[in-house]
């Protein structure tokens, strides 16, 4: 896009950033001071980097799925003699969103992301992945790896796993407590998912087997102070977890809008 168009009010783009090439992006809309809307005709992922920028700037945006659904409905009307209308288009769109949107859990180490994620997967009949569990298949015990290789090396491995899982759809994903310390993880998680932050008092957090949580309650308080703003910047919804997984699962209001 020419810099001469930065005064435009609407941005429409297609092709760049579609799976499996996400999160590629060629346009930085931060320079468009008068932008009022963004349309990206890509439908996989749900939110390209372009749309994530629009979301960050509170600019209305739309992906390509509504166009794809409407096209299919019109084809059915034309070739099969159906009489589907706006109501059917909206229902199909809601159903597809519900089926495809990932549920992402973030929060402090020991807050219960694994327990809650497993319960949500079982309740909704979804495939559940725990990032740390998946990493252990590749690098062995996480605590041992961090001790021997350092946290920076671990975060890079973690980011690679998040990027891999984030391209998929219809999953429940329990992340590690420190994933929010790597900014690029946000785009990988948000592109196809809604991010929920689980919270509970520091005194109730489990520290067993967690090398980065060792040091007792004071260390946990330090982590909480540092990471809370990061969790809040990632999350679309905050859910208090009181160690009752069924109640927490019921409290997660899965939303499929912006």
Task: Outline where the language-model segments fall.
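ATP-dependent small-molecule kinase phosphotransfer cores
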Residues: 133-190
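Adenosine-phosphate binding glycine-rich loop
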Residues: 41-101
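Conserved lysine of the Walker
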Residues: 113
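NTP-dependent small-molecule kinase module
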Residues: 90-98, 119, 123, 229-256
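Rossmann-like adenosine-cofactor binding region
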Residues: 8-61, 179-185
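A glycine- and Lys/Arg-enriched "phosphate-lid" helix/loop adjacent to the NTP-binding pocket
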Residues: 192-230
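Hydrophobic anchor at the beta1->P-loop junction of P-loop NTPases
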Residues: 105
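Conserved small/polar residues in nucleotide/adenosyl-binding loops
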Residues: 1, 5-14, 257-258
């Amino acid at each position: 896009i020419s810099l001469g168009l930065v005064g435009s009010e609407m941005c429409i783009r297609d092709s760049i950033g579609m799976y499996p090439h996400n999160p590629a992006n060629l346009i930085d809309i931060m320079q468009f001071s008068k932008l009022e809307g963004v349309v990206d005709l890509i439908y996989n992922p749900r939110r390209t980097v372009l749309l994530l920028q629009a979301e960050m700037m509170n600019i209305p945006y739309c992906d390509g799925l509504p166009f794809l659904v409407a096209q299919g409905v019109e084809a059915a009307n034309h070739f099969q003699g159906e009489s589907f209308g706006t109501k059917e288009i909206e229902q199909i769109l809601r159903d597809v969103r519900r089926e495809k949107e990932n549920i992402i859990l973030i929060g402090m180490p020991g807050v219960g992301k694994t327990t809650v994620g497993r319960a949500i997967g079982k309740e909704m009949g979804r495939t559940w992945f725990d990032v740390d569990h998946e990493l252990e298949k590749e690098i062995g015990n996480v605590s041992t790896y961090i001790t021997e290789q350092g946290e920076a090396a671990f975060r890079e491995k973690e980011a690679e796993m998040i990027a891999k899982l984030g391209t998929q759809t219809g999953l429940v994903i329990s992340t590690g407590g420190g994933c929010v310390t790597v900014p690029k993880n946000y785009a990988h998680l948000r592109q196809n998912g809604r991010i929920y932050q689980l919270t509970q008092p520091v005194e109730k957090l489990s520290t067993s087997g967690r090398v980065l949580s060792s040091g007792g309650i004071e260390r946990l308080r330090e982590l909480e102070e540092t990471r809370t703003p990061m969790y809040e910047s990632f999350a679309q919804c905050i859910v208090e977890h009181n160690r009752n997984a069924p109640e927490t699962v019921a409290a997660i209001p899965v939303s499929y809008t912006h």
